[in-house]
A protein has these predicted regions:
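Hydrophobic alpha-helical transmembrane segments
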Residues: 8, 12, 27-35, 57, ...
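Cytosolic-side transmembrane-helix boundaries in multi-pass membrane proteins
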Residues: 123-137, 209-248
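Transmembrane alpha-helical segments in multi-pass inner-membrane proteins
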Residues: 150, 165-225
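Alpha-helical transmembrane segments within multi-pass membrane transporters and channels
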Residues: 24-63, 201-202
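Transmembrane helix-bundle core of multi-pass membrane transporters
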Residues: 51, 55-112, 140-141, 161-172, ...
Length: 248
């Protein structure tokens, strides 16, 4: 399953973090987006499992709802993070938080039952189910954990950008493609090592590419074209065609 509510989750969690920091300081800045992101992930997983429809459709539809909440939370205005609570936007604090997220994700995938079952479901859902894995349960867990990490990203996003604008009409979707490209890159090269390492390398390559465009003064339209082509190529490399199927 795919989660296309990444952008909406980050936008709403960032807004919640900014508002919470005004009342609770750094405690609110850290705890509020983690709770918000986790709850959004849990909702995504439950709705996806209960409705039995494509995760793309479910998360796109839910993104509209989360964006509406972001408009309500800001009254249509920008929220600005106080200068007293921007430490996570500066080096080395931002790097430390990113490293913690990386180590936590790698640990979950490699050393826990959740990681083992996630790999099994991702490789072959039918086989995993026949082996006794509670597939619906662990899909919900995967969505929930993803939401937690989106909450972590929200902390970095609001701290670095210092402000956040509410989203509407799926405008938050623009935030989805960079992390998706890194994820597909990780899937393409996971056989050569740990997938989390591959994802980090993929994201670094993508950011270097974007920074190169900025340095060259390339227009945004060209950047979007290259991003789209790169996404298609990476997805093509990670997709396993099934032969012998007859479309009726």
């Amino acid at each position: 399953p795919f989660d296309m509510s990444v952008g909406a989750n980050i936008v709403l969690s960032s807004i919640i973090a900014c508002n919470a920091s005004e009342k609770f300081g750094y405690a609110g800045l850290i705890i509020a987006p983690l709770i918000c992101g986790t709850i959004i992930g849990l909702i995504n997983g439950i709705v996806y499992i209960k409705l039995h429809i494509s995760s793309l459709i479910v998360t796109c539809a839910l993104s509209l709802i989360y964006e509406a909440f972001s408009v309500y939370a800001t009254n249509g205005k920008n929220v600005i993070l106080s200068a007293d609570y921007r430490a996570f936007g500066d080096y080395p604090v931002n790097l430390i938080l990113a490293l913690i997220a990386y180590l936590l994700c790698a640990f979950i995938l490699k050393y826990t039952k959740i990681g083992t079952y996630t790999y099994a479901i991702g490789s072959n859902e039918v086989v995993a189910k026949n082996m006794g894995v509670n597939v619906p349960k662990y899909k919900i867990v995967a969505f929930t954990l993803a939401g937690f990490f989106f909450g972590l990203q929200a902390i970095l996003t609001i701290s670095f950008g210092t402000s956040m604008t509410s989203a509407s009409n799926l405008s938050s979707m623009s935030r989805n493609f960079t992390p998706l490209m890194g994820t597909f890159f990780g899937l393409a090269f996971k056989k050569y090592g740990h997938p989390v390492i591959a994802i980090v390398i993929g994201e670094m390559i993508i950011q270097l590419m974007f920074n190169g465009f900025v340095a060259l003064g390339a227009p945004t339209t060209i950047q979007n074209v290259v991003t789209g082509v790169a996404l298609l190529v990476i997805v093509a490399l990670t997709t396993k065609p099934v032969k012998g199927l007859v479309v009726k």
